[in-house]
């Protein structure tokens, strides 16, 4: 019997924001593989299945296990938080298969199940911060040299992109966001809006709307489940929301026909 490997994005962590297709393939699977925290997010969907839980740094072991199980004829779901194609497990799966000489037309079937990424879920909680061009940068230098990350931050800052920052800090990484702030201040004012979202759509969710001048005061809100969104030169704060205007105001009258009651 031919197996199949699904790489499944489960979104920010709450079932309400998991796609129907993601739930469907997890329920259809014989085997579930993933980082233990992410597997626990779908615990109620995996009763009676073979489950392989791994620590955070065991990405390669996760990839090898799910490929082995699928090659042995199992239907496997590799669980990834957010979207597996954005800093997720999709890349490692394809790299591992490519190294083994895999042929996507005749070999093991692989399907990526997209999910709601942190940039989507976090943006939805703070207004409309991503209405114009934006860049996404991860501060994690475990696999990418810090010098390259700095170059990318510099380019995004100089280009006046709204910047979404993944993995802004950890117990071992405390200087990265501080260095990033210094780079941003070369091109942006101190009152540039900044949002810090931790645990989006989870019970522990917290949201801070601040600016480049004061963002370091909220270091306790930073971590691996935090996302930072830095506005560009046109972004502004409005009643604790970040608005990144698309440009309609310069061409149209945006006043409502009737006064909105507060």
Predicted regions and their residues:
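Class I S-adenosyl-L-methionine
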Residues: 1-110, 218, 257-261
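A contiguous loop/helix-start segment that scaffolds small-molecule binding in enzyme catalytic cores
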Residues: 5, 158-262
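Short gly/ser/thr-rich secondary-structure transition/capping motifs
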Residues: 12-17, 143-146, 209
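A polyampholytic, Gly/Pro-enriched intrinsically disordered region
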Residues: 74-80, 128-138, 157-159, 213-224
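Short histidine/acidic/glycine/proline-rich micro-motifs that form metal-
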Residues: 83-84, 140-143, 168-171
């Amino acid at each position: 019997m031919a197996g199949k490997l699904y790489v499944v994005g489960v979104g920010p962590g709450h079932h309400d924001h998991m796609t129907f297709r993601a739930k469907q393939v997890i329920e259809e699977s014989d085997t579930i593989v993933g980082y233990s925290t992410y597997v626990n997010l779908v615990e109620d969907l995996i009763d009676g299945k073979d489950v392989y839980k791994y620590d955070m740094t065991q990405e390669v072991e996760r990839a090898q296990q799910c490929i082995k199980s699928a090659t042995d004829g199992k239907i496997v779901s590799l669980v990834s938080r957010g979207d597996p194609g954005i800093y997720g497990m999709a890349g490692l799966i394809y790299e591992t298969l490519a190294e083994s000489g895999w042929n996507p037309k005749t070999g093991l079937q692989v399907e990526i199940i997209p999910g709601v990424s942190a940039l989507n879920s976090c943006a939805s909680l703070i207004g409309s911060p991503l209405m114009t061009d934006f860049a996404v940068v991860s501060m994690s230098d475990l696999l990418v040299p810090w010098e390259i990350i700095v170059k990318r931050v510099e380019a995004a800052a100089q280009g006046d992109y709204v910047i979404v920052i993944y993995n802004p800090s950890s117990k071992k990484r405390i200087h990265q966001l501080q260095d990033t702030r210094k780079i941003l201040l070369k091109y942006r004012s101190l009152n540039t809006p900044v949002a810090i979202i931790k645990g989006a759509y989870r019970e522990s969710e917290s949201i801070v709307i601040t600016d480049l001048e004061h963002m370091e005061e909220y270091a306790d809100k930073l971590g691996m489940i935090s996302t930072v969104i830095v506005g560009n030169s046109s972004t502004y704060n409005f009643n604790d929301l970040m608005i990144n205007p698309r440009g309609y105001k310069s061409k149209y009258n945006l006043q409502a026909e009737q006064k909105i009651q507060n």
